[in-house]
């Protein structure tokens, strides 16, 4: 309101975005995050995701918040960590890489930030995850 009260239209919900457009934005988000590794680019941001969806970052943000119940940064971190977990388990392809190199390969500019986010999402540090994955693989080979 003009008196400083909250205005529901200041940050429109998904209802203010036409249904077809909402569906298209969601389809593009899902395609980009599930079928490409674009999110592993350290400069990947909501603007680039919105551009791929043919819309603006505000609409993209609203769809992410409404569908996933989280903000873009949280969604991006989850996909990056999921990919890091895959890479930490893939000794054949990534086994010679350091944790720092893997963190950079999934888009983190700071190894410390990567370790913090990885630990928050998985409950263990990346080095421990890699060690446990290798031990599990050894058990299967020796079984």
Q: Which stretches of residues belong to each language-model region?
A:
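Binding-interface segments
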Residues: 114
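Membrane-proximal linker segments that couple transmembrane helices to downstream signaling/catalytic modules
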Residues: 1-105, 117-120, 127-128, 132-143
């Amino acid at each position: 309101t003009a008196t400083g009260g909250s205005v529901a239209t200041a940050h429109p919900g998904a209802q203010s975005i036409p249904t077809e457009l909402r569906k298209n934005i969601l389809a593009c988000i899902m395609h980009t995050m599930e079928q490409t590794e674009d999110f592993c680019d350290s400069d990947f941001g909501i603007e680039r995701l919105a551009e791929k969806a043919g819309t603006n970052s505000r609409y993209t943000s609203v769809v992410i918040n409404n569908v996933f119940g989280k903000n873009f940064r949280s969604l991006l971190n989850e996909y990056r960590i999921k990919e890091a977990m895959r890479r930490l388990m893939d000794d054949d392809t990534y086994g010679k890489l350091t944790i720092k190199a893997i963190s950079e390969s999934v888009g983190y500019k700071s190894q410390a930030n990567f370790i913090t986010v990885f630990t928050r999402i998985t409950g263990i540090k990346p080095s421990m995850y890699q060690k446990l994955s290798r031990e599990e693989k050894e058990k299967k080979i020796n079984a």
